[in-house]
Design a protein with these regions (language model features):
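Conserved, well-structured ligand/cofactor-binding cores
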Residues: 1-454
Length: 454
């Protein structure tokens, strides 16, 4: 491998000749040989956006000239497109402020910009990082990445699953089945009503995420090192938020209090709480579906789900609810990530949180897993659900909880006696009620209509 020599304030470093990073990135590679978790590409993309926005803001305020702006913008466009992803090698387990990742971006954009300009025009600190600090750029990149990931990737997946549930609600209108509470038989419910509960869970948690996005669209940029805005020209914070908005097509604003924006990660904790709520709901939905599909002969068997692959290496013909299992594992991981995000966010000592890389790593993993998991769950399972009407009707009419319909006519205590007798003697509710003398056959038939109990 060929190398070139790069310098920083600590001296010279050998850097691979074909890489755009420089001395500080190389030092990080040598000092933090920990794990294989590369800084998320969503963060690299966000850095491309914020560095381009910062250059535009600095240009508007007369801090850089046209030539520098042009070179920076062109280099940033390559970062944004992902063309330069191979030049961002740093792991998550680095300085807690993300300083090395910020310098990685500064060095790559400067060296690529100089190559584009055909001369040594740009300096990583003096030009690419002008009016900025790692302490305000990394939190800004976190928010940009979080917003784009949720709005561009997660919301479309949620919307498709909601649409599928709406279709299933309509297709299954009029089908009445036994409800269940405590894993025990309960009063009747229509299959459409049950599905509507699943659908509304997704609608509610999407609404929670939309509320969380309000805080995530506030940017720390302009606070520099400790929130005071040292070395930042007047109007920079507002200008850079405007430029980020233009580049993303999303309305970002500058954070009202930069001291809070640097040391607290409230917005990410709040948003991840909504992701956790979504995961909890998906866990419940996937569990309901696999319970309802259990069988084929010894389970509930009230719905059919797609048969996607063989389920056992030893039991021929077995088919398992694999998409439900995958979805529930995703939910477990997201719920676990919430603990890491919350704990890391509590470590904002004095003017800066220094657990930011692990916060955004877990946050973006949660969004990615949920977006992909929901799409797979929808496409390979939920969209193919069909009702086993015969089994639903059989279970409904065998349910002892239908006795609840008799409460207004024979009273709670007599209804309980009827249910206990039917269960003990393995006879129908009708037979038990008549045998106990509470109603005649004609009276029973007149008042007992399970399909009307919903």
């Amino acid at each position: 491998m060929e190398y070139r020599i790069e310098k920083d304030t600590m001296g010279e470093m050998q850097v691979p000749a074909d890489r755009y990073w420089a001395a500080q990135t190389q030092r990080s590679l040598q000092n933090f040989k920990i794990g294989g978790e590369i800084m998320p590409r969503e963060i690299t993309h966000a850095f491309g956006i914020l560095k381009k926005a910062a250059a535009r803001a600095n240009h508007r305020l007369g801090k850089i000239n046209d030539e520098k702006l042009s070179a920076i913008e062109k280099a940033c466009d390559e970062v944004i497109s992902g063309e330069l992803n191979g030049h961002f090698p740093l792991v998550v387990w680095q300085t807690g402020s993300g300083t090395q990742s910020n310098m990685n971006a500064n060095e790559v954009i400067a060296n690529r910009g100089n190559e584009i300009a055909g001369k040594k025009l740009l300096h990583p600190n003096d030009d690419i990082n002008k009016s900025q600090s790692s302490n305000d750029t990394f939190p800004t990149a976190m928010h940009i990445a979080a917003v784009e990931s949720i709005e561009n990737n997660l919301f479309p997946s949620i919307d498709v699953l909601i649409a599928t549930f709406k279709r299933l609600e309509k297709e299954n209108e009029g089908i009445v089945k036994s409800g269940r509470t405590h894993l025990q038989d309960a009063v009747p419910i229509s299959f459409s009503q049950e599905i509507s509960g699943w659908r509304n869970m997704l609608e509610k948690t999407k609404g929670m995420l939309e509320l969380a996005l309000v805080g995530l669209k506030e940017l720390a940029l302009g606070g520099t090192a400790v929130g005071t805005g040292l070395n930042t020209p007047k109007g920079f914070a507002e200008a850079v938020a405007e430029e980020v908005s233009v580049l993303t097509g999303k309305k970002f604003i500058t954070a009202e209090n930069k001291y809070h924006a640097l040391t607290s990660k409230d917005e990410l904790v709040f948003a991840h709480g909504a992701l956790k709520a979504l995961a909890a709901n998906l866990m419940k939905i996937a569990n309901d579906i696999r319970w309802l599909a259990s069988g084929p002969r010894c389970g509930l068997g009230e719905i059919f789900i797609p048969e996607n692959e063989p389920g056992s290496s030893i039991m021929p013909g077995k088919v398992n609810p694999t998409q439900c299992e995958s979805m529930t594992m995703v939910a477990v991981q997201v719920i676990a990530n919430d603990t890491a995000v919350g704990m890391a966010a509590s470590q904002g000592n004095f003017e800066l949180n220094v657990f930011m890389p692990v916060i955004i790593y877990n946050f973006l993993q949660s969004v990615r897993l949920l977006a992909d998991g929901i799409k797979s769950f929808n496409d390979n399972c939920v969209s193919g659900i069909t009702a086993n009407k015969e089994k639903m009707a059989h279970n409904l009419h065998n349910s002892l909880m239908l006795v609840t319909a008799l409460n207004p006519y024979i009273g709670y205590e007599n209804a309980a006696k009827t249910a206990k007798k039917a269960h003990k003697e393995n006879i129908s509710l009708k037979e038990a009620c008549i045998s106990l003398g509470f109603l005649t056959e004609e009276e029973f038939d007149k008042v007992f209509h399970p399909e009307q109990m919903i």
